[in-house]
A protein has these predicted regions:
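Active-site neighborhood of HAD-like aspartate-dependent phosphohydrolases
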Residues: 1-35, 123
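Acidic, Mg2+-coordinating phosphoryl-transfer loop and its flanking beta/alpha structural elements
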Residues: 109-143
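Substrate-recognition "cap/lid" segment bordering the active-site pocket of phosphatases
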Residues: 66-109, 115-118
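Short, structured coil segments at secondary-structure junctions
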Residues: 59, 88, 124-125
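Short, acidic loop-to-helix structural element flanking the phosphoryl-transfer center
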Residues: 22, 31, 35-65, 72-77
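Short amphipathic alpha-helix with an adjacent loop that forms part of the alpha/beta core around
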Residues: 101-105, 140-146
Length: 146
């Protein structure tokens, strides 16, 4: 939601969209391509076109980023470096997607682009917002009084 994973992937895959690549090549080859690019793949990931607008709105609430790493340790390092370089002082928790729900609590909000993560978060007692765009997420946050 902050970074443009698709743009980075398409650059690494000579223009093939992530969903198409994974469908045609399989999940293992998908992650091999990404992880083969090393830590730079993650550190160099560009902002989403509306990512800074979204961040500017939420930063006053001192959000904690909850992000899923890839299979490789390089993604963990790369994501930490990206946050350090772009959002200094922001806390980052790395957790597999299936484990994100373990961080849910009544007053915690998960903003995520995967419906399954939102569903699990809500089932665990948290507030979930399915991120489609910065404008839509900001609208939903305002509806919550933020």
């Amino acid at each position: 939601m902050l970074t443009d994973f698709d743009a980075s992937f398409m650059k690494a895959s000579d223009g093939i969209r992530p969903s198409e690549y994974e469908r045609n090549m399989g999940k293992d080859k998908f992650w091999e391509l990404i992880d083969g690019k090393g830590v730079g793949y993650w550190v160099g990931m560009p902002w989403m076109s509306d990512g800074k607008q979204y961040w500017d709105y939420i930063k006053e609430y001192k959000p904690i980023l909850l992000s899923s790493p890839s299979r490789s340790q390089t993604s963990r390092l790369g994501k930490r470096l990206w946050v350090r370089n772009n959002l200094p002082g922001t806390k980052l928790i790395l957790a597999q997607a299936k484990d994100k729900q373990n961080y849910a609590q009544k007053n915690r909000i998960l903003i995520d682009d995967r419906p399954s993560n939102i569903d699990q978060w809500r089932e665990s007692g948290g507030v979930g917002i399915l991120h489609i765009s910065a404008a839509d997420t900001i609208r939903q946050l305002k509806e919550l009084g933020l």
